[in-house]
C-alpha cells in the first residue's frame, strides 16, 4: 500500500517538475533535443527516488 502511494506521489511530482522544466526550456529557446534530455533525466531521477524511498521504508 505504501509503495503504491509512493509511486503515485512520485509520478505527480515528476510530472510537475517535467512541466516546469519544459516551460523553462522553451522560454530559454533551447532546441527540442534538450527538452527530451530534460524529460529523460527526470524519469531517471524519479525511478531512483522511488526505489530509494521504497527501500528506506
UniProtKB/Swiss-Prot annotation:
Keyword annotations: Membrane, Transmembrane, Transmembrane helix
Transmembrane domains' residue ranges: 15-37
Subcellular location: Membrane
Example of a GO cellular component annotation carried by this entry: membrane
Membrane topology qualifier: Single-pass membrane protein
Domain of life: Eukaryota
Descriptive protein name: Putative uncharacterized transmembrane protein DDB_G0285779
Annotated source species: Dictyostelium discoideum (Social amoeba)
Biological classification of the source: Eukaryota, Amoebozoa, Evosea, Eumycetozoa, Dictyostelia
Amino acid at each position: 500500500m505504501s509503495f503504491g502511494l509512493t509511486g503515485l506521489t512520485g509520478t505527480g511530482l515528476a510530472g510537475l517538475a517535467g512541466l516546469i522544466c519544459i516551460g523553462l526550456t522553451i522560454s530559454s529557446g533551447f532546441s527540442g533535443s534538450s527538452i527530451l534530455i530534460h524529460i529523460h533525466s527526470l524519469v531517471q531521477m524519479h525511478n531512483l527516488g522511488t526505489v530509494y524511498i521504497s527501500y528506506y521504508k
